[in-house]
């Protein structure tokens, strides 16, 4: 693989993409609105299907000279799509501020704002997903917003791994034939579902043909072969590697056009694309260099899709994370380690391009090869924040035992979005359902249920730190407060999921999720084989450090009185600086392999997980839990007053999810692994995230790379589910903040995703800069 290179074609296409400006586009919103108006008396599923079909047949499309893979959901590169079905109120309020907001800016056109206000918004006012949720439960959701962030209130869910192998096997025509056969013999209540799937698949066929027609009409010689591929794919499944990759990209473009959601993930691409690659290699119709160039064109396409979020959500999901997660390596259905040339070519593509998308993941296990690990380490050393690593030894068994996933499906797990775990092609995992702020709940428990920042009564008044005579009394009150907010969160979640069923059925997605066509049931209504929902715990590290400080300094050693600590928290440590220093330095912290401290983390993660087992989601499936933050540790920290771990009010919480608080992991990276290994992996079946930062110099020698491989093998042996790395100097980040024009291509691992550092808001940049940096293992 070392002889492979990046071609001029790829360099030119990359440069053009990176120089493209981001705009908010209303083109699809215009079509959707017209179709809904023309078919006002039809059901929402039928209107959704007709509007997607119309968009596929009418949206203006474009191609770039020299592309090997074509297709996009807008004419422009990196345009964010206004999607009225999911929510219009926020865009109506924020349209003018999109170019200047603190995070994730988009340019806007005055004529688009005018058309939106005069023609689109008036129709959708009161009719969208956002309006339905606000009208039903909006007040209650707002009341708990400092503790719980309910997601998917104004956009589609996404966070799913379609059955790409099925799509490649049948293509849209084959899936349409299957749906038509089902329609002939279906029950009355299934009829509309099959009619909708046929409509959207007809649209998919036309969409592919339109790219052929465009290339022919514009006589673009460099794309003539690509045009033929597009026409062929509209009629039958792919046969060659190039055809398979083009078909795969069409699948994901259409999924985004249907739902405008993040985290539709290709999954184990090196496994299901390998037969096409191998066949072409054996026939001498494809070289490794040609295959790499095709993959790199696909990589560029992944980076052309950006997601338009409201201003508040942009804080929680900063840097345009779109979540095309590709997982390479790992075991097969029989438990054997499997990696191949495509695994290595995916790593080579990331090595060459260093772009934020796709979110490249490597699955490791006890038998992972030296070749794969060293190829991955080489890419890590370049500092793009990729790949991240997942541990089969930690992940598969809890999926089987805790969630009831069949062994073959668990072994074939994929990752969606950042670090969320899913089965491949048969699960609506709803993995980004909500985020639960442990630290705000503790704050309320210590202060009569009142917010330290506003004195507002938010939680139950169970007493205060002054009234809890023992540490056990505090724990009992904390449990009750957690239970109270879990109940509130679950009530809100049921409302949100029901609204998605009613307002955003997804006929096209349902054709590529196993069991939906068989059942005649949309995926939002429970058509998938597995129906999970995932809740994130935010942030265990701060919680552990706070409880450890209270336990040791207040109740055990009595070095600080209950009264004084509560006063210090209420005053944000003003006048209590000596106490703050004690809280920071006199108590061992999570991440240093101190057993009693680390076990506090496991205690509360398990408590939360067990409570979640009491609930089922609106599709009849179980809730499960994860530990990852995306970028929510910054805005969620802004909701929390001063905390007993010595943290000042409004400051960010720990990054990641399983990561220690930055600057407090003093015993090195191996100690961090040992601390994290004490967390029960049944608590992270929805995904867990461990961030680490190393200096680039560590990887300059062969010895350093071998030591890093041994560190990764220790990660596997300790059964830690996830780890990822930033490889960067603090000085470079500081310079990038001051001189962003000199660091436009600097990518950084934020949480479970990579973003351009200079595109992040200042507070998030500061948090990343201050993360612990390791010089050695």
Language-model features: where?
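Low-complexity, highly charged intrinsically disordered N-terminal segments
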Residues: 197, 204, 208-211, 215
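Conserved catalytic cores of very large enzyme subunits
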Residues: 1-197, 221, 225, 229-232, ...
């Amino acid at each position: 693989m070392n002889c492979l290179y990046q071609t001029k074609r790829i360099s030119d296409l990359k440069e053009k993409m990176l120089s493209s400006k981001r705009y908010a586009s209303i083109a699809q919103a215009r079509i959707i609105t017209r179709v809904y108006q023309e078919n006002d008396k039809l059901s929402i599923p039928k209107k959704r299907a007709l509007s997607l079909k119309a968009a596929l047949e009418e949206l203006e499309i474009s191609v770039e000279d020299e592309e090997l893979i074509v297709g996009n959901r807008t004419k422009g590169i990196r345009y964010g799509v206004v999607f009225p079905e999911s929510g219009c109120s926020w865009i109506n309020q924020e349209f003018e501020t999109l170019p200047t907001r603190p995070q994730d800016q988009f340019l806007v056109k005055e004529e688009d704002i005018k058309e939106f206000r005069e023609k689109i918004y008036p129709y959708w006012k009161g009719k969208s997903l956002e309006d339905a949720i606000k009208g039903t439960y909006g007040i209650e959701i707002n009341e708990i917003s400092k503790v719980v962030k309910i997601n998917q209130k104004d956009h589609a869910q996404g966070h799913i791994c379609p059955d790409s192998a099925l799509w490649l096997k049948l293509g849209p025509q084959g899936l349409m034939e299957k749906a038509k056969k089902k329609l002939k013999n279906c029950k009355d209540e299934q009829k509309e579902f099959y009619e909708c799937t046929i409509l959207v698949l007809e649209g998919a066929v036309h969409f592919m043909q339109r790219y052929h027609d465009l290339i022919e009409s514009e006589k673009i010689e460099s794309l003539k072969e690509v045009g033929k591929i597009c026409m062929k794919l509209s009629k039958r499944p792919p046969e060659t590697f190039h055809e398979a990759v083009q078909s795969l990209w069409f699948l994901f473009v259409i999924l985004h056009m249907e739902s405008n959601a993040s985290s539709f993930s290709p999954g184990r691409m090196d496994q299901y694309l390998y037969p096409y690659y191998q066949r072409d290699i054996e026939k001498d119709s494809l070289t490794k260099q040609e295959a790499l160039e095709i993959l790199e064109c696909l990589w560029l396409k992944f980076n052309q899709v950006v997601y338009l979020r409201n201003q508040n959500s942009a804080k929680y999901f900063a840097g345009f994370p779109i979540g095309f997660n590709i997982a390479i390596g790992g075991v097969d259905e029989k438990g054997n380690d499997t990696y191949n040339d495509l695994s290595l070519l995916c790593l080579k593509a990331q090595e060459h391009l260093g772009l934020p998308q796709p979110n490249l993941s490597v699955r490791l296990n006890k038998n992972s090869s030296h070749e794969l690990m060293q190829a991955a380490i080489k890419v890590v050393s370049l500092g793009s924040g990729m790949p991240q690593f997942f541990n089969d030894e930690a992940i598969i068994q809890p999926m089987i035992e805790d969630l009831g996933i069949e062994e073959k499906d668990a072994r074939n797990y994929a990752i969606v979005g950042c670090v969320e775990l899913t089965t491949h092609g048969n699960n609506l995992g709803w993995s980004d359902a909500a985020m639960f702020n442990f630290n705000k709940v503790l704050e309320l428990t210590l202060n009569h249920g009142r917010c330290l920042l506003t004195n507002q009564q938010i939680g139950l008044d169970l007493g205060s730190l002054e009234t809890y005579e023992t540490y056990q009394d505090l724990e009992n009150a904390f449990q009750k407060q957690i239970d109270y907010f879990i109940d509130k969160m679950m009530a809100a979640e049921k409302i949100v999921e029901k609204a998605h069923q009613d307002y955003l059925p997804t006929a096209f997605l349902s054709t590529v999720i196993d069991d939906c066509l068989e059942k005649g049931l949309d995926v939002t209504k429970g058509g998938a084989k597995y129906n999970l929902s995932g809740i994130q715990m935010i942030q265990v590290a701060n919680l552990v450090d706070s409880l450890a400080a209270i336990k040791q300094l207040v109740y055990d050693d009595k070095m600080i009185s209950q009264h004084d600590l509560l006063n210090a928290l209420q005053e944000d440590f003003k006048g209590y600086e000596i106490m703050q220093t004690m809280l920071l330095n006199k108590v061992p912290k999570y991440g240093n392999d101190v057993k009693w401290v680390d076990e506090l983390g496991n205690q509360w993660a398990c408590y939360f997980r067990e409570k979640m087992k009491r609930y089922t989601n609106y599709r009849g499936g179980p809730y499960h839990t994860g530990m990852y933050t995306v970028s929510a540790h910054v805005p969620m920290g802004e909701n929390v007053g001063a905390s007993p771990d010595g943290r000042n009010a409004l400051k960010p919480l720990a990054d990641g999810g399983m990561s220690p608080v930055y600057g407090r992991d003093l015993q090195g990276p191996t100690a961090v692994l040992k601390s994290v290994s004490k967390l029960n992996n049944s608590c992270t079946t929805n995904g867990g995230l461990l961030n680490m930062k190393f200096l680039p110099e560590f990887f300059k020698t062969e010895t350093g790379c071998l030591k890093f491989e041994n560190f990764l093998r220790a990660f596997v042996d300790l059964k830690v589910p996830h780890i990822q790395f930033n490889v960067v100097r603090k000085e470079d980040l500081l310079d990038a903040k001051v001189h962003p024009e000199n660091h436009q291509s600097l990518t950084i691992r934020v949480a479970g995703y990579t973003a351009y550092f200079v595109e992040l808001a200042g507070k998030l940049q500061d948090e990343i800069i201050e993360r612990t940096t390791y010089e050695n293992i």
